[in-house]
Amino acid sequence: MQLITEQVQKSMEGSSWIRKMFEKGLELKTRYGADAVCDFSLGNPDVPPPAVTKDVLETIAADAVKPLGLGYCPNAGIPAVREAMAQYINRQQGIHDSEVRCNAGHVVMTVGAAGALVSFFRAVIEPGDEVVCPAPYFVEYASYCGHFGGVLKTVPSKSEDFSPDIEGLAAAITPRTRALLVNSPNNPTGAIYSAEVMAKIAKLVDDVNAARGESGRPLYLLSDEPYRAFAYDGVTVAPVLPLTKWSIVLGSFSTTLSLAGERVGYIALNPAMPGVETLAAAVTLTNRTLGYVNAPVIGQRLVAGLLDTTVDLGIYDRRRKLMAEVLTAAGVEFAMPKGAFYFFVKAPGGDDLAFTDALYEERILVVPGRGFGGPGYVRLSCSVDEQIIARSAEGFKRAVAKMKG
């Protein structure tokens, strides 16, 4: 008896390496105790939310007992929250041109950035359509577009700094390509794409759309930005909306406010985009018909009250620097991440599975890079206490020595 679809069965059998390492981590922690395991496998933000979160929640709680205090809201989100988000995005993107300034009508509140992507793909993808993105990439992208018969096409990035290969992206685009998806700061590499690179990507999108003409289906530039606030060493994250009218920004507050469980995100459409009202209406519809209905009301109001603050990003920077010291002392090769809170490091000898196993024997959990389209590397998350990072130092040395021996 076939209980589930072949597509889901295949997905279950090839479950993500993050999930596999999570399960292996549970085995280690059960056997040796949680304090004896250094778990760098999950990107679960652990820094406390801003202190003002409590005050905002108290205000929300007072309103919650009023009639419809926690009732349905418009499918696109609470109007006042959408307007606040629009102004936040304008500031974040450095938008001063009135033609490109967002208002509430250009913003849809979603169930996390993931919900934004899924709702967008449902609105624009037909079976056989393609989404092109640089690799390594966030592991779930393929599933998000695959739900609707879409195909994720990945293009290897430049190995020295994980910068996108512009020529490779251009070569991957076909008449069936509906979106070019970028993620900067990047998960899993921590790379931040330069303003020059982003300008070239935007020009590529404009050139493709010029060739397709007004009667063709447009190519969209999707910028997935949940880690935008996580930029170090004076590096800035290039804005996308001013670069091309075909740009769309997605984001969430899982990391910047440590609200991962609240599942609040957004999608912001470029106001200068032809047909922007139609696309906004379509994403609002798919946000509802996919079963999300509307983003969580408490989460929306909470985010609106916290837009001018973030978690203590200095904590993540200190962890980043400590992790770099540990890896350097162990002889691990890596590009220093400029953003997010991940390291994507070379596996000695190029075998990411063998390196993952060697670290596992030292009770250190990482994720093989092949799970992100980057074989030969492993991903480490710095969303852990500094004591755990320091405690892993000798284990890294032994694992590297074993790989090189």
Language-model segments: residues:
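Conserved core segment of the aminotransferase class I/II
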Residues: 245-317
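Short beta-strand
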Residues: 37-39, 250, 333-338, 370-371
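N-terminal small-domain helix-loop-helix segment of the aminotransferase-like
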Residues: 4, 8-112, 119, 299, ...
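Conserved core of the PLP fold type I
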Residues: 67-216, 228-243, 389, 394
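PLP-dependent enzyme catalytic core of the Aspartate aminotransferase-like
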Residues: 87, 91, 170, 354-357, ...
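Conserved glycine-rich beta-strand-loop-beta hairpin in the small C-terminal domain of fold type I
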Residues: 297-304, 316-327, 334-346, 376
